[in-house]
Amino acid sequence: MFSKKIPHTLESDSDITSPLDLWYQERHNDEVSFGLHVKKVLHSVQSPFQRVDVFESTGFGRILTLDGLMMCSDRDEFVYHEMISHVPLLVHPNPKRVLVIGGGDGGTLREVLRHDCVQEAVLCEIDGEVVEAAKQFFPSLAFGLNHPRAKVHIGDGVDFVKKSAAAQFDIIIVDSTDPIGPGVGLFSGEFYKEVKRILTPGGIVMAQCESPWENKFDLAKVYGNLKEAFSSVYSMVGTIPSYPYGYWSWGFASDDVHPFESINFEKARAIEKGTKYYNVDIHKSAFALPNFLKQKLHGVVKNA
């Protein structure tokens, strides 16, 4: 995760390492990595599930990493959180109860609570250390964690869904980590079938589905697991510079709702006055996929 040794050429065959040269590095694979210059380590704790770190970086502000993997940064977190939240909320006819699985940083919850129609937003995060780190170091993300319309449950998302009564959430947002470690169970077909069980009729699931450029995960399988539970699955894409390859995808799944044909334009125009990335044009164009991704997801998602 860290690279402290930055060569400085003094003579033809000598170098030194400055104690001020601290870099965060996320290796995507054996050929590609992403790095940020770190000014200060603000927080580091080993929870029962993962290592939770907060750094102050030079170019991206504060960053939150879990087991060395980038979760969010001050500079571009709004892209992820706005898209995963506003797209489903602005096409559902009457979203009153929303469940966020994962998302302990609070960013998705923050965006959900922009919608006055949401009477209750429940967040289920497996790791309380993530929530505490967000409250301490990311106040602009975490203010929703103490909102009167929000309920925060610390526990396993898979268990929470299994123990929940049927047909009680209008929208479920799966704001998970990668399909490894604590997040692996949140990508299975069995999990999505349980998620569907606790959705109200006409409900929507929105799930993060990894980078289209990443080859270590079978993207067709990731979306195919959603398709095991829902008749209509769409892929949505967006640019997030701090995430692997700078290009991300989400899955929109429902049996009844189209991802952009029923946008509530009045609400969308009001919402986009306070967003940095989301607008109606972006909403619609995010479902236009490049050919290489259409080929990967042909026969799996509706827009491929």
Residues covered by each model-derived region:
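SAM/dcSAM-binding transferase cores
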Residues: 2-53, 224, 245-304
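The AdoMet/dcAdoMet-binding core of the Class I SAM-like
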Residues: 4-23, 47, 72-204, 213-223, ...
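Conserved Class I S-adenosyl-L-methionine
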Residues: 192-193, 218-240, 251
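N-terminal glycine-rich anion-binding loops that anchor highly charged ligand groups
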Residues: 52-62
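A general beta-strand register signal
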Residues: 65-66
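Structural detector of well-ordered beta-strand residues that form the stable sheet scaffold
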Residues: 205-206, 234
